[in-house]
């Protein structure tokens, strides 16, 4: 699997590019800002961008979406339906043009195909109602649900601490030692988070 990442302004959001090099097909995850950097990351892959995947609808994860749609009109943009309202509110607040025709939704248990890659969708509410985690091969694209040594905030509009704990417990119960690629900060391993992350440890005891 092809894999690349950049940090995007304004809140140093990790934006990821995943792809199947044989099929020359890629997807961008959480293009939160710095559209010129996101576009450069896509173009240097020498693959065709097929979709935009959003782990949730907060502005620091969707800020470059409309710039990408200006360059690649009609590109599908996937988001969980429970976060459609936050995403649309963000568009209004930041005066982003509406590209609703490109909007798609995905939910728990869905599997997206990207060449030979299979992207598994887990609904992990808590940081936001529609937060998702994406699993592809041995990589966990965790959004703002799980961080290295921590977890996402739940005291934001739409946040729910109990739901977040349930989501962390679900992630902790997964088989395998995924590489955890969070929405902010450095990567980790799921085994390490199970052992040392106090939030995940607490969640798994409940």
Positions of predicted regions on the chain:
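Residue-level detector of beta-strand face positions
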Residues: 5, 17, 111-113, 118, ...
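Residue-level detector of conserved, well-ordered beta-strand and adjacent loop positions
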Residues: 4-7, 19, 107, 113, ...
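Conserved beta-strand hairpin/beta-sheet module of binuclear metal-dependent hydrolase folds
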Residues: 1-45, 133-143
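Conserved beta-strand segments of alpha/beta enzyme cores
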Residues: 2-4, 48, 76, 104, ...
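Active-site neighborhood of phospho(di)ester-bond hydrolases with catalytic His/Asp-centered motifs
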Residues: 28-29, 50-57, 77-80, 123-126, ...
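Active-site HxH/HxHxD metal-binding segment of metal-dependent hydrolases
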Residues: 26, 33-113, 195-202
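Metallo-beta-lactamase
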Residues: 86-92, 96, 118-206
């Amino acid at each position: 699997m092809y894999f690349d990442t950049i940090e995007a302004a304004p809140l140093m959001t990790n934006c990821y590019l995943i792809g199947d090099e044989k099929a020359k097909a890629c997807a961008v995850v959480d293009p939160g800002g710095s559209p010129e950097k996101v576009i450069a990351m896509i173009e240097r892959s020498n693959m065709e961008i097929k979709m935009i995947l959003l782990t949730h609808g907060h502005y620091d994860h969707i800020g470059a979406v409309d710039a990408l749609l200006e360059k690649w009109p009609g590109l599908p943009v996937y988001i969980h339906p429970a976060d459609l309202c936050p995403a649309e509110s963000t568009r209004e607040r930041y005066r982003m043009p509406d590209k609703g025709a490109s909007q798609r939704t995905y939910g728990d248990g869905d599997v997206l195909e990207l060449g030979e890659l299979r992207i598994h969708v887990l609904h992990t509410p808590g940081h936001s109602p529609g937060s998702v985690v994406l699993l592809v091969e041995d990589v966990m694209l965790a959004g703002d649900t799980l961080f290295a040594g921590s977890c996402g905030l739940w005291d934001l509009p739409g946040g729910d601490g109990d739901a977040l704990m349930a989501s962390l417990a679900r992630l902790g119960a997964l088989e395998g030692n995924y590489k955890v690629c969070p929405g902010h900060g450095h990567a980790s391993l799921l085994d390490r988070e199970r052992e040392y992350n106090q939030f995940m440890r607490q969640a798994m005891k409940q």
